Amino acid sequence: MLGLHRESDAIVLAIPAGGLAVAVVIAKELNLTLDLAIVSKITPPWNTEAGYGAVAFDGTVMLNEELLPRLHLTSKEIQQGISKTEEKVRRRMKKLRGDRPMPDLQHPIILIDDGLASGFTLRTGIEALRKAGSRQIILAIPTAHKESLQAVAEKVHAVYCPNIRRGSVFAVADAYEHWRDLDEEEVAGLLEDFTKMASKAV
């Protein structure tokens, strides 16, 4: 599916942590530049897996206004969640990007995550990339919830997703035979290994 972009001027952007493991494989296979688009979901205090919005690398914040009333969070709790996530994004930017500038986003962007549940992490990333000048965004994800994917698909030029699921209960991890969360050290190591491999291939 993504073979059309092999050795093109497209840039693979991974949303860490989990998206990088997927993106490394795709970038190697297609012989493309790999970089990061750091986005993190905003979670309620009692559940670090469920998100009610996300914060992107440029400070873009998006909230799931339909979900928020059902969570019964106070305005203070919502703002605390946003602030905590903004700090997480800043930390990841410093650790994983350092002083390295973003790549030229005028190139076609293949945006990759490990899956799509509510879609707010990807929607926030797409919005940030648009603000930064991206004109062509291609979404590539291994698995997604159908309704959420339909909402996100309207915001990109193309979608590649081999495993689309329906139902009221959806978890990205369920689509994988082996699943575990990557920590920031592992993400940094994966990116460093890819960079070394790419430099040797030049």
Model segments located where?
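PRPP-associated nucleotide enzymes
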Residues: M1-V202
